[in-house]
Design a protein with these regions (language model features):
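Basic, Lys/Arg-enriched alpha-helical interface segments
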Residues: 2-57, 74-77, 93-96
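Conserved strand-loop elements at the edges of beta-sheets that form or border functional pockets
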Residues: 7, 62-64
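Short, conserved catalytic or interaction motifs in soluble domains
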Residues: 47, 62, 85
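Structural motif corresponding to alpha-helix initiation and N-cap regions
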Residues: 54, 64-65
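Short hydrophobic/aromatic beta-strand element in the GNAT-like acyltransferase core
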Residues: 57-59, 68-69
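Enriched for short, Lys/Arg-rich terminal
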Residues: 67-68, 72-97
Length: 97
């Protein structure tokens, strides 16, 4: 299963890592590595994440960090539609593309 980012998700990831890098370069590296681990797990087990009210969208936590990855699972492809800090207003979470 391949993983593809929407343009919005790419911007969100760059924003998260850019913010972290400005305040803690080591923290940015750790969060980036953990996001990659979570995405690797999703490529093997695409239904791992929790269902959302916007089915078929799912979300998975980037533990121990406070980030959520929102994605659409598919047979051959996972589409990442958003990466958000868990404390953000729920109404700002992504819709389906």
């Amino acid at each position: 299963v391949t993983i593809r980012f929407t343009p919005e998700a790419t911007i969100e990831l760059e924003d998260v890592l850019g913010y972290l890098a400005a305040h803690s370069p080591g923290g940015a590296r750790n969060v980036s590595a953990r996001i990659q681990q979570v995405l690797s797990n999703l490529s093997e087990y695409p239904l791992t994440g929790m269902r959302t009210s916007l089915e078929p969208m799912r979300r998975v936590a980037v533990t121990p960090y406070p980030y959520l990855i929102f994605y659409l699972p598919g047979d051959d492809e996972i589409i990442v539609v958003g990466i958000r800090h868990a404390a953000r207003d729920p109404s700002s979470m992504p819709d389906q593309p």
